[in-house]
């Protein structure tokens, strides 16, 4: 296995092409197709999709009934088949072909010097500017063979073209109007196993039609859990009564991977790498997809499968798709604003319902001046405001221990006072010393032993105090630990920060919490004074503050469990898709190896934009795998209630992640050893 090969990780490079049409000149059009096919070959593309009636042109109307044109189409088609024998891509080319007593609007599927099959257009429009049935026959229900170049090849709308050496690549083809009907052929094909859906389109442009196409293609890719490759006719088509924009686009499960400039001068291609393993994973998890297949089994089981050997390149061809560094945090500013609005209000509404159900208890929260407790506090404040409850019913406690820094403690105090909540400070130092002495810990006799017991005595006492205060004052303990910490087991179990009465942060990863706080600042919800404190919190190193300063420069969470940016990246791929470690490493390398490439979320400081080598990615992935699969599940199995927030998933044992607490991570670690280079 070549780790750097996209094809080895289930990607398929596809191209949606629009060329310069020479109407009524099939030889010229075939030559244009061949030029673009060679360019796609050089790009390492496995598929090249061309517009409807590629070889004749779409806009030639009754000329389609002329024998000379049809003869020239067949000759040009055979030349194209022969000339493309040494090319990698599967070519999907439009052609009017004679069959029985009619002409059919077809897509001819060509690979390595052979015609794999011919797909007729199912639905021919005869409304508004369209009059296709005047010249051609509808292909819905057609199943059989057609004679091309002296050979019988498969003909019908029931064809799936499957790469025998790339199991995730199964192609189905439909033509233009087929996408616009309520039950398109591609939907049946997806249920039958197609992962890549191609559409050859004529589709003249009018105001608003491009957006209609985008909506339909996006919807098809999302509903079918598939890729949708769309290519429309452009320059060179007749403008006697119509115009053409040459729109090409590639969608994958509702996400736009590539789109070309419309109204191009000359040829254009949209090229992207489709993740067939992602599509397979989504279908595997969404059981109703296969339930739908069973319901339509008479249709789906009648599809014919045509196998071919793709023989894709084994080397590094790069990766032609955006891999988000922060899959929980979109880089698009508008989408990030929307996500932050939704995440924040999911948390707030979740807490509101719990408070209503308990007849409005006080909210008891430990505040440290760190990200998580800061965000939980502002969520609680907003919930109280919405419910018309006094902010003084929030009881915020600073619980300094042996290593609490003045900066973080001051941030906690300033924030609590600026918000107008009830604030108190309880120094746990004396109680912690007593406990350490009682259990005979070396620290109690002056030894500088800062082990896990030393840390957990402090973490446990903080939680113990909060629960007893909640008992005393009629409150509930609000948890602050986030999704990233739950994934890594970076919490103290039981009587510790793992436990609470309700946790608003349980579904929010660390990387998103930072942006939620930025969003709250920019929204100005709590005023300028609160915003200044929140910014100070954002500027502070993430630390548990459990080991005394001076022994280490600063106790860093990320030095122990890894950069949260990388670990959140791995968590998303594992939780949402169940990807292998080798694929996660491949994606992480493309996302993180160059800080100058790709997009960063808005507001992300330039001075804090890291890059990671493959060796670093591999090391922290090993840490993630060990902690996630083997070490930390017992903490998640006893997780308090809290709302799911992200589409990436949550870790509640009652929801997205149900796993045994006593499992080994060996198979994942072995796969890293075998398949991820050491850098």
UniProtKB/Swiss-Prot annotation:
Pfam families: CN_hydrolase, NAD_synthase. Residues 639-658 are annotated as: Disordered. PROSITE patterns: CN_HYDROLASE (PS50263). Keywords: ATP-binding, Ligase, NAD, Nucleotide-binding. ATP binds at residues 366-373, 480. Pathway: Cofactor biosynthesis; NAD(+) biosynthesis; NAD(+) from deamido-NAD(+) (L-Gln route): step 1/1. The formation of the intermediates complex at the synthetase domain stimulates the glutaminase activity. CDD domains: GAT_Gln-NAD-synth, NAD_synthase. Deamido-NAD(+) binds at residues 354, 456, 471, 475, 485, 490-493, 501, 635, 661. It catalyses: deamido-NAD(+) + L-glutamine + ATP + H2O = L-glutamate + AMP + diphosphate + NAD(+) + H(+). GO terms for cellular component: cytoplasm; peptidoglycan-based cell wall; plasma membrane. SUPFAM superfamilies: Adenine nucleotide alpha hydrolases-like, Carbon-nitrogen hydrolase. Residues 337-679 are annotated as: Ligase. Transmembrane segments: none annotated. Residues 12-276 form the CN hydrolase domain. GO terms for molecular function: ATP binding; glutaminase activity; identical protein binding; NAD+ synthase (glutamine-hydrolyzing) activity; NAD+ synthase activity. Homooctamer; composed of two stacked homotetramers that form a ring-like structure. NCBIfam families: PRK02628.1 (NF002730). An ammonia tunnel 40 Angstroms long allows transfer of ammonia from the glutaminase active site, where it is produced, to the synthetase active site, where it is used for the ATP-dependent formation of NAD(+). Catalyzes the ATP-dependent amidation of deamido-NAD to form NAD. Uses L-glutamine as a nitrogen source. In vitro, can also use ammonia with comparable specific activity. This is Glutamine-dependent NAD(+) synthetase. The gene is nadE.
């Amino acid at each position: 296995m070549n780790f750097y090969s996209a094809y080895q990780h289930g990607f398929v490079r596809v191209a949606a092409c629009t060329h310069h049409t020479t109407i009524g000149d099939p030889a010229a059009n075939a030559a244009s197709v061949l030029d673009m096919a060679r360019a796609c070959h050089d790009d390492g593309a496995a598929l090249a999709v061309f517009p409807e009636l590629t070889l004749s042109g779409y806009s030639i109307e009754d000329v389609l009934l002329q024998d000379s044109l049809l003869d020239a189409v067949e000759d040009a088609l055979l030349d194209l088949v022969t000339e493309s024998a040494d090319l990698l891509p599967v070519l999907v080319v439009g052609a009017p072909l004679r069959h029985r007593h009619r002409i059919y609007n077809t897509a001819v599927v060509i690979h390595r010097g052979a015609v794999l099959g011919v797909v007729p257009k199912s639905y021919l429009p005869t409304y508004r500017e369209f009059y296709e049935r005047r010249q051609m026959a509808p292909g819905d229900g057609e199943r059989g063979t057609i004679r091309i170049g002296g050979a019988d090849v498969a003909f019908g709308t029931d064809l799936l073209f499957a790469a025998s050496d790339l199991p995730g690549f199964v192609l189905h083809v439909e033509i233009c109007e087929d996408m616009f009907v309520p039950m398109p052929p591609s939907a049946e094909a997806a249920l039958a196993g197609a992962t890549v859906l191609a559409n050859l389109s004529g589709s003249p442009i009018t105001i608003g039609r491009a957006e209609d196409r985008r909506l339909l293609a996006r919807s098809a890719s999302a509903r079918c859990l598939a890729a949708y490759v769309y290519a429309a006719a452009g320059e060179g088509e007749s403008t006697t009564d119509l115009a053409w924009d040459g729109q090409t686009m590639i969608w994958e499960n509702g996400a736009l991977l590539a789109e070309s400039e419309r109204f191009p001068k000359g040829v254009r291609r949209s090229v992207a790498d489709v993740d067939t393993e992602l599509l397979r994973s989504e279908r595997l998890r969404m059981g109703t997809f296969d339930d739908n297949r069973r319901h339509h089994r008479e249709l789906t089981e009648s599809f014919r499968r045509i196998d071919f050997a793709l023989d894709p390149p084994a080397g590094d061809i790069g990766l032609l798709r955006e891999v988000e560094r922060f899959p929980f945090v979109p880089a698009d500013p508008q989408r990030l604003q929307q996500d932050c609005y939704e995440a924040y209000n999911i948390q707030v509404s979740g807490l509101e319902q719990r408070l209503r159900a308990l007849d409005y208890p006080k909210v008891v929260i430990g505040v440290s001046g760190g990200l998580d407790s800061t965000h939980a506090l502002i969520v609680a404040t907003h919930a109280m405001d919405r419910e018309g409850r006094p902010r003084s019913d929030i009881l915020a406690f600073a619980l300094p221990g042996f290593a609490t820094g003045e900066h973080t403690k001051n941030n906690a105090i300033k924030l609590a006072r600026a918000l107008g909540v009830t604030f108190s400070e309880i120094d746990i130092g004396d109680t912690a010393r007593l406990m350490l002495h009682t259990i005979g810990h070396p620290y109690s006799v002056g030894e500088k032993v800062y082990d896990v017991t030393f840390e957990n005595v402090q973490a446990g006492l903080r939680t113990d105090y909060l629960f007893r205060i909640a008992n005393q004052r009629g409150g509930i303990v609000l948890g602050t630990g986030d999704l990233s910490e739950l994934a890594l087991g970076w919490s103290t179990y039981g009587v510790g920060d793992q436990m609470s009465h309700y946790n608003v942060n349980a579904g929010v990863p660390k990387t998103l919490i930072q942006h939620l706080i930025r969003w709250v600042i920019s929204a100005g919800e709590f005023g300028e004074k609160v915003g200044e404190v929140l910014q100070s919190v954002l500027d502070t190193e993430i630390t548990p503050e459990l080991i005394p300063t001076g022994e280490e420069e600063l106790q860093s969470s990320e030095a122990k469990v890894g950069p949260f940016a990388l670990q959140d990246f791995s968590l998303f791929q594992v939780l949402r898709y169940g990807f292998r470690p080798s694929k996660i490493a491949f994606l992480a390398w493309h996302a993180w190896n160059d800080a100058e490439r790709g997009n960063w979320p808005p507001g992300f400081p330039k001075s804090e934009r890291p890059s990671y080598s493959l060796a670093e990615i591999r090391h922290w992935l090993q840490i993630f795998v060990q902690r996630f699969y083997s070490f930390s599940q017992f903490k998640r199995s006893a997780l308090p209630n809290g709302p799911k927030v992200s589409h990436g998933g949550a870790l509640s044992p009652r929801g997205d992640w149900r796993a045994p607490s006593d499992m080994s991570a060996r198979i994942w670690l072995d796969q890293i050893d075998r398949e991820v280079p050491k850098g």
